[in-house]
Amino acid sequence: MENVLGFVALAAGLIIGLGAIGACIGIGIMGSKYLEASARQPELMNALQTKMFLLAGLIDAAFLIGVGIAMMFAFANPFQLV
């Protein structure tokens, strides 16, 4: 039983850690491409900024869904009978 709970804790940590790394890399790449596009065509900066912030929110939402799933794994009892 202790092994299963240990693996669940490890899995929850991996879900949160890898999700955070992926979200940070994605937002970083998106921000750099936004700056490149704004430098090339400054007249499109407002439209691009709106889309960038919308996508940043969606990327963060995907990470937070992963955190919720990890918390469900962490606090659920796999040995509970239905």
From Swiss-Prot:
The record marks 60 as: Reversibly protonated during proton transport. This is ATP synthase subunit c. It is a multi-pass membrane protein. One of its GO terms (molecular function) is proton-transporting ATP synthase activity, rotational mechanism. It comes from Aromatoleum aromaticum (strain DSM 19018 / LMG 30748 / EbN1) (Azoarcus sp. (strain EbN1)). Pfam families: ATP-synt_C. It is found in: Cell inner membrane. The chain crosses the membrane at residues 7-27, 53-73. It comes from the Bacteria. Signal peptide: none annotated. The gene is atpE.
